[in-house]
Amino acid sequence: MKNNIMYYYNIRIDNITQNNNNYYFTINNDNYCFTIYTRDIKESNEIYKLNKYMLSSNILVHEIIPNKDNYVVTIINNIPYILYKIYINKNKKLTINELTYLSNYTYQVDKILTRNNWNILWSNKIDYFEYQINQMGKKYPILVDTFAYFTGLAENAISYVKYTTLETQIETSDNPVISHRKINNTIESLYNPLNIILDHKSRDIAEYIKLSFLNKNTNIYQELDSYFSNNYYSEYGLRLLYARIIYPSFYFDMYEQIIQGLRKESDLLNIVTLLDDYELYLKEMYYYLKKYHNIPEIDWITKK
């Protein structure tokens, strides 16, 4: 891969290290990552435009480097790749302040990068997963045993979003902001241009709240107190936030990793053992959020 990078980007590399689909190298003390491009090819130009806008506005983000022919995506052996320069310590832990920093920025972009029809996206994902389970269920007994519970949670979240759009008004505070497809424990992916989309500001915070449960973050409510003191939420926005907290993205992410052979199926048991605590967490989070707006309750959660 080193020779390919040197050829397509006219750069000299002494050493390169591989971690899964990522190739890391350093030039003049600058760190780079050459990685497989996993987004829709049709999005690549908009991703690059957004990346240039963020850089020109002094918004922290890794910098996409076009190849020698000025293309964003480089095809090697029929596989699309992209190169970007890393601007942060990739091992630094994620904080709620990092999320807030990026969610303060809006951007007028082609709808191709916008992800705001959650109930449709979630419904389509569940339908596809149900098809997979029917085809491969015997191979994954733990997935089969847990699937109905987590799709039930997802259906609750979908209904919550549907009623939110029918019963509440969107305000200017609900405009799409810089958000992320995935949130994890370190901040390298937070500033990865391939991870950036436009969505409601509640998206990233909800994922952080769920991650806080899995990481046993005992300071989450103090962090949220600080967050809400500086970030106004409409009733519409707060209901979206709670819907996304209910939606078990951590389960479906693990589901996909298991199907792709990236994780062991037995890893699911670590989540299953936490279900009672997680239901209590959903209840506590509902009453916490209700301080800001009188959002609807879900009976089976609040009566735990």
Please provide the spans of the model-predicted regions.
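ATP-binding glycine-rich phosphate-binding loop
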Residues: 2-29, 66
